[in-house]
Structures are given as structure tokens and as C-alpha cells.
């Protein structure tokens, strides 16, 4: 299975929308060219969570619809998509996902496991830490989806994160980890 991993899109309310559209078209073309089977977005589709503009909703809807038209698309929330300090506030993605009602668009808001063929996507949600779980079946390909900082992670540039919300050990039992939030 060929999986595309995207994170930290940070669509702004008013700025860079022409540039976003150009880059998004390049992403769509590449995903089609690569013939991906699955797309995963690991958080921070939005740049701000409390004051969203119609322009944000237009561009984010365009992005998510086109991703879902290409392949089944799974999205988790990042710290910019929802309000960690007020769980009763709506996040920045649910209204779009609900309005699109696209069969290939799956918003995974809570911690838990979603099985796609022989792959299990295990969401470790920053909004639902009390319900984190380990993979339920080691015969599957288990992929952790997490948006947050992780102590001890070394990036492709050699930078090592010496602080983090959680240690790297939270991913034990997973075959792969798809992250968001670390912009290096």
C-alpha cells in the first residue's frame, strides 16, 4: 500500500491563497502520478482555530475535496485545528468534512483505531489523551498518527528534540509513526 503523509498545511485566513492553490495543484498532480492508495493529514490544516474566514473555508474545502477525490483521506486534528483549552468549541475541520460528506474523507477526531485493509491507523489525539491505545493486532501494519512534539526525535536534518509533550516510547508496538507539529 502506498500512503501519502501530509501535515502542517497551516492555511491562513487571508494570506498566500494564490500560492496555496499553486502548491495544492502540484500536490494533487504528484499524488495522482504516484497513484497513492491512502492519504493521511496529521494535523494543522488551519493556521488559526478561533477566528476563521470564509476564504479559509473555501481553500480548505478545495484542498480536502481534491485529496478525497484522489484517494481515501484520513485527517487528525492538530493544535491549530481545535481549541485545547475549550473542548466545547467547534474545531476548524468538522464543518468542512460534514458539508462535503465525501465517502473518501474521514476525520478522526478522537483517539482510536481505524482499519483500512491490512493497515491500522492508530490515532493518538492531543484532544483525547485519556483514550490512547496500543495496536490491537500485531499482524496488521500499525501506524501511529500523532500531532505534537516528541522527546528524543531526530529529524532528517540531524536536529534532536530535547523537549516534548511525550517520550518516543508512546509509539511502542507501531510499525510506523506519522507525525505533525515538528516543522523541521
Task: Pin down the residues of each PLM region.
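Active-site metal-binding loops of divalent metal-dependent hydrolases
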Residues: 7-11, 44-45, 79-81, 125-127, ...
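Hydrophobic alpha-helical segments and their boundary regions
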Residues: 67, 169-170
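Extreme N-terminal starter segment of soluble prokaryotic enzymes
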Residues: 1-4
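Contiguous mid-protein beta-loop-alpha structural module that forms a pocket-lining wall or clamp
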Residues: 171-184
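Core catalytic region of metal-dependent phosphoesterases/phosphodiesterases
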Residues: 9, 13-112
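Conserved acidic residues
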Residues: 37-39, 140-142, 175
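Conserved catalytic scaffold of divalent metal-dependent phosphoesterases
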Residues: 81-169
Amino acid at each position: 500500500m502506498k500512503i501519502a503523509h501530509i501535515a502542517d498545511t497551516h492555511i491562513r485566513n487571508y494570506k498566500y491563497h494564490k500560492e496555496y492553490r499553486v502548491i495544492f495543484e502540484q500536490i494533487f498532480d504528484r499524488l495522482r502520478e504516484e497513484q497513492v492508495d491512502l492519504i493521511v493529514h496529521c494535523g494543522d490544516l488551519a493556521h488559526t482555530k478561533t477566528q476563521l474566514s470564509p476564504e479559509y473555508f473555501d481553500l480548505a474545502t478545495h484542498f480536502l475535496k481534491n485529496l478525497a477525490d484522489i484517494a481515501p483521506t484520513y485527517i487528525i486534528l492538530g493544535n491549530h485545528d481545535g481549541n485545547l483549552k475549550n473542548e466545547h468549541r467547534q474545531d476548524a475541520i468538522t464543518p468542512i468534512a460534514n458539508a462535503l460528506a465525501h465517502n473518501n474523507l474521514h476525520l478522526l477526531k478522537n483517539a482510536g483505531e481505524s482499519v483500512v485493509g491490512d493497515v491500522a491507523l492508530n490515532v493518538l489525539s492531543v484532544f483525547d489523551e485519556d483514550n490512547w491505545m496500543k495496536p490491537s493486532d500485531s499482524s496488521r501494519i500499525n501506524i501511529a498518527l500523532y500531532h505534537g512534539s516528541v522527546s528524543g526525535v531526530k529529524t532528517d536534518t540531524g536536529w534532536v528534540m530535547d523537549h516534548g509533550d511525550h517520550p518516543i516510547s508512546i509509539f511502542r508496538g507501531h510499525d510506523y509513526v506519522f507525525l505533525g507539529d515538528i516543522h523541521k
